[in-house]
From Swiss-Prot:
Pathway: Purine metabolism; AMP biosynthesis via salvage pathway; AMP from adenine: step 1/1
Protein EC: 2.4.2.7
Catalytic activity: AMP + diphosphate = 5-phospho-alpha-D-ribose 1-diphosphate + adenine
HAMAP family noted in UniProt: Aden_phosphoribosyltr
Gene transcribed to yield this protein: apt1
Main function: Catalyzes a salvage reaction resulting in the formation of AMP, that is energically less costly than de novo synthesis.
Coiled-coil residue spans: none
Family according to the record: Belongs to the purine/pyrimidine phosphoribosyltransferase family.
Species assigned in the record: Rhizobium etli (strain ATCC 51251 / DSM 11541 / JCM 21823 / NBRC 15573 / CFN 42)
Keyword Cell membrane: no
One of the protein's GO biological processes: adenine salvage
Protein name stated in the entry: Adenine phosphoribosyltransferase 1
Amino acid sequence: MGNTISELAASIRSIPDYPNPGIIFRDITTLLGNPRAFRRAVDELVQPYAGTKVDKIAGMEARGFILGGAVAHQLSSGFVPIRKKGKLPHDTVRIAYSLEYGVDEMEMHRDAVQPGEKVILVDDLIATGGTAVGATQLLRQIGAEVVGACFVIDLPDLGGRRKLEELGVVVHTLVEFSGH
């Protein structure tokens, strides 16, 4: 697995000083554009849940839709998009969540997950954890059981993984990058 993980890390483009000076943006579009790396990433994201009954995969906008859809397909689970407010056409449930520099809102269709269903969160990256914590709270608000969260990238210096684990969510990541 170590070789696979180093190959995945090498397939992620790092862009310095984007979107702000001092930030290194981790761009997974290069991973997504490489069929072998994309397949390996999805296989590795799915691996901890093989043989586990998972009702739904919840993907966070926007790259979580790509990865989450692939994970849902592999696990024969349904897929639930968690979107920024105002983007879904039917009856929704919404929650405000904290960002590094403010507050935003996310929503999902109220009927997308039934109480008691087992759900895994999927996104490309966990940094401060604001979005993932908000998504966890949103899913729990409607009675879902969040049984895990998986991300291609973890930025451990920003503490997001720890915040999710403090909520009792088991976190699975593939690649760690230090710094911001």
